[in-house]
Amino acid sequence: MGIFRRLVQSDSSQVYPFVFKITTTAANTVFTVPLVDYAGLTPSLTISWGDGSTSPLITSSSSTNRIHTFVAAGTYTITISGFMPGFTVNNNSAIRALITELVQWGIVGLRTVNFYGCNNLTSIPGSSSLSGVGGYTGLGEVLSFASFMRGTRLTSIPSDIFDYSPYATTFSDTFGSILTLTTVPTGLFDSVTGATTFASCFFGCTALTSVPSTLFDQNVNATNFSGTFRNCRALTNVLQFTNNQSVSTFANVYNMSSTSNALTGTAPTLWLRNPTPSGTAAFRNCTGLTNYASIPANFK
């Protein structure tokens, strides 16, 4: 199924907007849509603010027309139509708590997107519920999922969220610091075979208890697993990374802040690979591993 989906391209004749909701609790709340350029690409879009007003055409990520004042407190549906190469909240304290719901991705030409720090965002809509508005095909041109849902409060991840994103290479901090995430679905990264970095991908997911043993099996081009599961102290199983032979760094991949962690099983003998990848503190404090005593000092 993943291979089939990688071959599916967005129908350029279809135009669907990017839609999300914000909730304000005070009068005259100012909200700035977090537009960014990407690799020389600039926006060309309009914004319907959900209060009866619409912006003029915006052709710059720094345009003042991306800023809006909501006179009354309430919940507003913001609709972005046109071309938007980048939407990155980046933990912006002025807007992160205001975003409460992702309604649809639409098809707007996204290359990078993140809701980093949106701690009132608890779910990603399933692809079936979006079938009439582009599904997940609007993520088909995304190259970077860095900090994608970092610091949100997701309780689950749709297994097919990346199935239409064959060009994506960057998955650093993608689901980092999600304190409400307990499991990861099988096949999550199967379609992103060109991915090169999963650095800190699940860093600090302190409630995460298990991940599929095959999670990264298709990611043969990955070179960086630095800190991927760092401080995931409830995690019980350790991956072997058998198919990931191009990796140059596993530094801090399972680094735990203390020995009070649940990790068990046998550590992969990464230090025996040739060439030897960087493994600084890769298994620090992972004393529950059956071969912990034989792990070289520079890997723990």
What positions do the PLM features span?
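N-terminal capping/linker segments that flank leucine-rich repeat
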Residues: 1-143, 159-166, 191, 218, ...
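Intrinsic disorder/low-complexity signature
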Residues: 8, 202, 216, 234, ...
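Consensus positions within tandem repeat domains that build extended binding/scaffold surfaces
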Residues: 113-116, 143-150, 170-176, 197-203, ...
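Hydrophobic face of beta-strands forming the core of extended beta-sheets/solenoids
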Residues: 124, 133, 145, 157, ...
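Tandem repeat domain/solenoid detector
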Residues: 152-160, 164-169, 173, 177-196, ...
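Long, intrinsically disordered low-complexity repeat domains
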Residues: 196, 206, 211, 221-223, ...
